[in-house]
């Protein structure tokens, strides 16, 4: 066996040779800077298009711009940027959501002579976000941000930032009309072009410097590898802040004159079928799909025979994949499924090309275009292949970083070539440690090269990858170490992928503080493992595959006092930890057995199977006593349970409220039996909806917003599992035969009595969202009048004086507000449609909203026009109750949480509208800024940050 040889020879003429290949089918004009790329594309292919589908749930249409129009717009935008009066070469942090906005901002910065730095989505955890922004500010020595209104709000609490809005810049750009080749300054190939931030999985982010030369070297080679031409059509849904989204799927195709369609990730992830529809509709040739999407598409579509033969997929020639390993059987199943879905399977011929790349290498630099339909993969995961032109790879001894490994032996993967980054910005130490002699970049990955083809076998770096996103293991371990039952410094989390598993997971190894053979070991182990799982889900959205307790005297540390993840994982794979795993399973079975009840009736068994399907459990592991929300159920899962239950039991409807009230298998089964056999009479109204019941701390009572419903709280309630019960209060009128409330006093009396029935005595913690805030305030007053202690009254984005606002809202306004809250219409539509709709009948107005509503959202909410009409009446009844509301009296203390208001500035909202709450509190009133806007502060993106802030205020009040 011979030492691993370099695969591609890098010479000073590599870019020239690529340019020669490029020019053979194009023109003698060869771009050498990014400026040239844009000019060339606009001049040579003026009518070719950039297409965009935004993140809006209300508009999935494709918006297009020709290369010529885009070129003109971004040059005017660049000219407007000059008015910032920044020195040439200044760094502008670009923090935007949509592809079109990001693309325009990056090109404008470049053309204005600035250096854009693309900022990924900021953390929802306030401390982490503030630490990152402060780090970026110090790293660049400046703090100029170009963002949108939502982005500005996210960083508004951080001092010292110079924030500019893209919307204002666009308005300023309308005053300019520069030439089609305008630039503010001349640049050279080795000048800084774009900065990309690393994931920060092992600490604060580093800023990767890519020059015009490194980007063009990568893009020339990528285009050659993909077979791009000016007739190609590209589909991208990777975020523009990622090198794959901006360089691989935008600049590389632009260099070759290829048309592009950029889709916000949410549009694909919420409806994977859209991926195939777009391939068909736009004759896509090259697209990107990570392993988890390949697997999801296959699972969702392989059994949908009604869709077979529905799509024209003959255009697609290549699907790139990256971010995580591609499972060979998944790739084969995906290809087979696409052939079944195609109108003409014989014309479906494409490669799935897994690749290796990093931010430092301009994304993919090693590819394996595999036709899995004609050749059998050699391994469980598809190999990653060979380098693109200009790139070299080698495998070396990770200890010294230079000694080559022989063919077939694993070691550290290193790459070099003109597409490798030049340096980390303002971080000479990290740059130096990333390279070894000869310009080889140390990737931190462990690989094997056989016959010139590379595959990965592990990572040196301390991360775990979940759906292509890297999470830092040390940070996760820090939080896991805090769990009661874990011996301090004797816990390690290690990445792990089980044989046949589609995505990577991880294992937690730890030494328990208690004796595994002690009298109460089962209950202690159960509590410890439940807490470890809860923290893992909250931190990285994934529970551990295995949790292995090992007696402390059997957990060996290195001479430096550290646990070796590699050693522990090796012992696990070799079966050396089997006795500890068996003991843990025995104890957990004992603990679970104490409360486990085998589903007995056919209804219970059917529900157990539905629960198992939703949570990926074995049916035999679902107890009749299992609670839907304690298993991890979300608001989306509630809708799925509702749909599957209605289908399984042949019921026209299972009311959502009944699922919320009966989340336990046996309880829901009893309700369904009653519904099927004799129908369920309208039961006595009870506003209390128990969203989760575990934990010993003071319960939370959360009052509904102005729409009356409480599903908005389901995701928030999950964060209080094993800490404190979480009850929501739902308005009256949703169920048949229930009258609406007719006054605020009637509502408050009902809610206060319900709270007392649920928790007989204080101290109480009660809060309300929006309209529910004033109701919560009144309930707190009522409880105090009964002689009870209310230690926490939380008011979420609502002022004390609401009567004037209630009088402003007519039926049309209320209907549009509700429709926006439910995600049926956009905020702009809700604001703009009212004047033209008011002269119409109620039915006509509802028809307009119905036509604007995304069909998938209507299905998700199980809405009909009649149900929407009734819901508007419920919301209207609450508005009527608030029209005469005049706050008075006081409570012991108030905690006010404020977000971006529906109208006006946040500063005015706080100082003029919310500060008057001080008149109604006998103690100090706190005012806490929370992420998001009025209608989004508890959505999936913002609830992780909100719950942390909300919990901190509970703790501050001694709860």
From Swiss-Prot:
Pathway recorded for this protein: Secondary metabolite biosynthesis
GO process annotations (BP): biosynthetic process
Thermal dependence of function as given in the entry: Optimum temperature is 25 degrees Celsius.
UniProt region (Thioesterase (TE) domain), positions on chain: 699-946
Broad class of enzyme this protein falls into: transferase
Region entry Thiolation and peptide carrier (T) domain, spans: 603-673
EC number: 2.3.1.-
Domain of life of the source: Eukaryota
Annotated Carrier domain residues: 598-676
Modified residues (O-(pantetheine 4'-phosphoryl)serine): 635
Signal peptide range: none
Activity at various pH: Optimum pH is 7.2.
Region (Adenylation (A) domain), start-end ranges: 59-466
Alphabetical UniProt keywords: Phosphopantetheine, Phosphoprotein, Transferase
Disulfide bridges in this chain: none
An annotated Gene Ontology molecular function: acid-thiol ligase activity
Gene3D superfamilies to which the protein is assigned, alphabetical: 3.30.300.30, ACP-like, alpha/beta hydrolase, N-terminal domain of ligase-like
Family: Belongs to the ATP-dependent AMP-binding enzyme family.
Role this protein plays: An L-tyrosine:2-oxoglutarate aminotransferase (probably invD) and atromentin synthetase invA1 catalyze consecutive steps to turn over L-tyrosine into atromentin, which represents the generic precursor molecule for the entire terphenylquinone and pulvinic acid family of pigments, which are widely distributed secondary metabolites in homobasidiomycetes. The first step catalyzed by the aminotransferase converts L-tyrosine in to 4-hydroxyphenylpyruvate (4-HPP).
Official protein name in the record: Atromentin synthetase invA1
Species this chain originates from: Paxillus involutus
């Amino acid at each position: 066996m011979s030492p691993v040889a370099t695969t591609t020879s890098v010479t000073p003429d590599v870019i020239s040779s690529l340019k020669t290949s490029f020019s053979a089918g194009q023109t003698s004009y060869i771009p050498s800077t990014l400026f040239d790329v844009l000019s060339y594309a606009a001049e040579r292919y003026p009518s070719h298009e950039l297409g965009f589908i935004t993140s809006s749930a209300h508009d999935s249409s494709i918006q297009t711009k020709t290369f010529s129009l885009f070129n003109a717009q971004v040059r005017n935008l660049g000219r407007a940027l000059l008015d910032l009066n920044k020195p040439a070469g200044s760094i502008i942090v670009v923090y935007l959501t949509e592809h079109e906005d990001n693309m325009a901002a990056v090109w404008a910065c470049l053309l204005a002579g600035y250096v854009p730095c693309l900022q990924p989505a900021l953390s929802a955890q306030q401390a982490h976000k503030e630490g990152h922004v402060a780090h970026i500010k110090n790293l660049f020595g400046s703090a100029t941000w170009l963002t949108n209104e939502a982005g500005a709000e996210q960083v508004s609490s951080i001092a010292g930032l110079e924030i500019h809005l893209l919307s204002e810049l666009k308005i300023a750009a309308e005053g300019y009309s520069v030439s089609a080749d305008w630039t503010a300054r001349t640049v050279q190939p080795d000048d800084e072009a774009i900065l990309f931030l690393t994931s920060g999985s092992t600490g604060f982010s580093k800023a990767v410097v890519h020059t015009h030369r490194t980007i063009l070297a990568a893009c020339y080679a990528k285009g050659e590898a993909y077979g791009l031409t000016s007739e190609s059509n590209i589909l991208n849904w990777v975020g523009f802040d990622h090198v794959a989204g901006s360089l691989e799927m935008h600049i590389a195709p632009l260099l070759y004159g290829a048309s592009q369609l950029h889709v916000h990730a949410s549009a694909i992830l919420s409806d994977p079928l859209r991926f195939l529809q777009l391939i068909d509709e736009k004759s896509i040739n090259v697209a990107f799909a990570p392993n988890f999407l390949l697997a999801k598409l296959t699972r969702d579509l392989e059994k949908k025979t009604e869709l077979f033969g529905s799509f024209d997929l003959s255009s697609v020639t290549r699907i790139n994949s990256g971010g995580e390993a591609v499972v060979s059987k998944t790739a084969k199943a995906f290809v087979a499924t696409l052939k079944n879905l195609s109108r003409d399977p014989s014309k479906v011929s494409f490669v799935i090309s897994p690749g290796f790349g990093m931010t430092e290498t301009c994304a993919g630099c090693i590819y394996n275009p595999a036709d899995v339909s004609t050749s059998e993969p050699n391994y469980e995961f598809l190999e990653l292949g060979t380098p693109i032109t200009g790139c070299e790879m080698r495998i070396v001894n990770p200890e010294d970083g230079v000694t080559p490994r022989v063919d077939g032996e694993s070691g550290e993967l290193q790459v070099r070539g003109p597409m490798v980054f030049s340096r980390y910005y303002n971080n000479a130490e990290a740059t130096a440690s990333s390279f070894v002699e000869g310009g080889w970049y140390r990737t931190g990955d462990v690989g094997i090269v056989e016959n010139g083809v590379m595959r990965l076998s592990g990572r040196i770096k301390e991360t775990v990858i979940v759906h292509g996103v890297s999470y830092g293991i040390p940070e996760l371990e820090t939080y896991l170490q805090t769990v009661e039952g874990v011996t301090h410094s004797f816990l390690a989390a290690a990445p792990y992928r089980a044989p046949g598993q589609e995505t990577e997971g991880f294992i937690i190894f730890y030494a328990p503080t208690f004796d595994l053979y002690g009298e109460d070991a089962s209950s202690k182990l159960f509590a410890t493992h439940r807490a470890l799982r809860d923290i893992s889900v909250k931190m990285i959205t994934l529970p551990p595959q295995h949790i292995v307790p090992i007696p402390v005297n059997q957990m060996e540390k290195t001479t430096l006092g550290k646990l070796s993840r590699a050693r522990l994982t090796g012992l696990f794979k070799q079966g050396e930890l089997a006795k500890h795993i068996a003991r843990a399973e025995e104890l957990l079975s004992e603990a679970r057995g104490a409360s486990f009840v085998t589903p007995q009736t056919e209804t219970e068994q059917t529900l157990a199977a539905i629960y198992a399907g939703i949570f990926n459990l074995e049916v035999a592991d679902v107890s009749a006593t299992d609670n839907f929300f304690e298993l991890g159920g979300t608001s989306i899962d509630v809708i799925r349970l509702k749909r599957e239950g209605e289908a399984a039991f042949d019921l026209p409807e299972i009311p959502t409220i009944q699922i919320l009230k009966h989340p336990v298998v046996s309880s829901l089964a009893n309700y369904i039996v009653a519904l099927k056999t004799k129908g369920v009479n309208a039961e006595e109204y009870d506003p209390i909806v128990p969203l989760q019941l575990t934990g010993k701390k003071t319960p939370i009572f959360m009052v509904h917003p102005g729409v009356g419903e409480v599903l908005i709280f389901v995701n928030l309630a999950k964060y209080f599992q094993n800490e404190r019960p979480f009850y929501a209060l739902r308005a009256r009128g949703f169920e048949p035969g229930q009258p609406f409330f007719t006054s605020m006093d009637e509502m408050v009396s009902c809610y206060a009595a319900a709270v007392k029935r649920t928790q007989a005595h204080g101290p109480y913690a009660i809060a309300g969202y929006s309209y529910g805030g004033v109701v919560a305030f009144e309930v707190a007053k009522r409880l105090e009048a009964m002689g009870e202690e209310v230690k926490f009254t939380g008011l979420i984005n609502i002022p004390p004086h609401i009567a004037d606002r209630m009088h402003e809202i007519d039926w049309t306004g209320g209907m549009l507000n509700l429709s926006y809250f439910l995600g049926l219409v956009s905020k702009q539509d809700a604001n703009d449609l009212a004047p033209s709709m008011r002269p119409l009948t109620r039915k006509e107005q509802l028809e307009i909203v119905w036509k604007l509503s995304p069909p998938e959202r209507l299905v998700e909410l199980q809405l009909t026009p009649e149900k929407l009409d009734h819901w508007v009446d419920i919301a209207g009844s609450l508005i009527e109750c608030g029209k005469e509301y005049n706050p008075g009296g006081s409570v012991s203390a108030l905690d006010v949480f404020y977000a971006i208001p529906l109208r006006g500035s946040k500063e005015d909202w706080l100082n003029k509208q919310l500060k008057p709450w001080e008149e109604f509190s006998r103690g100090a009133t706190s005012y806490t800024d929370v992420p998001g806007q009025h209608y989004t502060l508890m959505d999936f993106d913002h609830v992780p940050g909100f719950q942390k802030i909300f919990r901190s205020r509970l703790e501050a009040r001694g709860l």
